[in-house]
Regions:
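Acceptor-binding helix/loop patch of EC 2.4 sugar-transfer enzymes
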Residues: 23-63, 104, 108-109, 166-178
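Short N-terminal targeting/anchoring amphipathic segment
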Residues: 2-10, 24-26, 217-220
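Carbohydrate-associated surface elements
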Residues: 81, 100
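Short acidic alpha-helix that forms the nucleotide-activated donor recognition element
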Residues: 67-70, 185, 204-215
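Conserved donor-binding/catalytic core segment of Leloir-type glycosyltransferases
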Residues: 117-139, 145-150, 160-161
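Acidic anion/phosphate-binding donor-loop and adjacent secondary structure
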Residues: 88, 101-119, 210
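Acidic donor-binding loop of glycosyltransferase active sites
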Residues: 73, 210-225
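Nucleotide-activated donor-binding/catalytic signature segment of Leloir-type glycosyltransferases, i.e.
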Residues: 164, 168, 172-206
Length: 225
């Protein structure tokens, strides 16, 4: 091949030079782990995972990444934040190329509506939307849930739509016998009008797009990860 494009995350690029030594390599570099001022020490309200085991695990992961950077002719990453997780020696070799957003579809749509239980929700409504694959602290679920009482106090006619599942994500598992979704929702459910809050679970693509199109506010929260 003239060009091989690959992801450096789990060692996929490590041995390709052994097979095709003359080929040009373009590496998609997603994230470089840091031991300070990073995801592992960001949120002391949930956990501060700076144990020796975690630090050594991240050093070991980075060692694989570094071996792949060494054989890369070019490196790309989607955002400036991701580029900034790398040391200067590597940052100077990385180009930021955004993955793109289809703004012909992902934009407000006055004709779109979403049926949720007995409600038909559209752009005329106040809609606060949170979307994450996993509803977990790593993606700010706990912070969002804690904000709902104030949101509904100021806007009692708002709809709160939450899309995402209970499966394991990037962070630690919840306490045994519960989910992150249940744990944090239980902390606020007696303080709010729960008829305004809808957990939609994992939805198909059409419903996801419609939710984006009718949202007044789309909330995205995350650890620095």
């Amino acid at each position: 091949p003239d060009l091989i494009v690959g992801h450096t995350g789990w060692g996929e690029m490590l041995f390709l030079k052994e097979v095709w030594p003359e080929t040009t390599y373009l590496s998609y570099v997603e994230f470089h782990y840091n031991l300070e001022n990073s995801d592992i020490d960001f949120d002391e309200t949930v956990f501060m995972d700076k144990t020796p085991y975690t630090r050594r695990k991240l050093i070991a992961r980075n060692s694989s990444f570094i071996s792949q950077y060494a054989i890369s002719d070019y490196m790309i990453t989607p955002t400036q934040f991701q580029k900034n997780t790398f040391s200067k020696d590597y940052r100077d070799r990385i180009e930021v190329i955004h993955e793109g957003i289809d703004t012909d579809i992902l934009k407000p749509n006055d004709k779109a509506s979403l049926k949720v239980n007995d409600h038909i929700i559209n752009k005329n409504d106040k809609v606060v939307l949170l979307v994450n694959r996993s509803l977990e602290p790593y993606r700010g679920y706990h912070s969002f849930i804690k904000s709902i009482p104030n949101i509904l106090k100021d806007h009692p006619d708002a709809y709160i739509l939450i899309i995402g599942g209970d499966q394991k994500g990037y962070g630690a598992d919840p306490e045994k016998g519960t989910t992150h979704r249940e744990k944090y929702y239980n902390e606020i459910k007696d303080k709010v009008d729960t008829s305004r809050i809808f957990f939609l679970g994992l939805v198909d693509y059409k419903i996801l797009i419609t939710a984006f199109q009718i949202a007044t506010v789309h909330v995205y929260l995350t650890y620095p990860f």
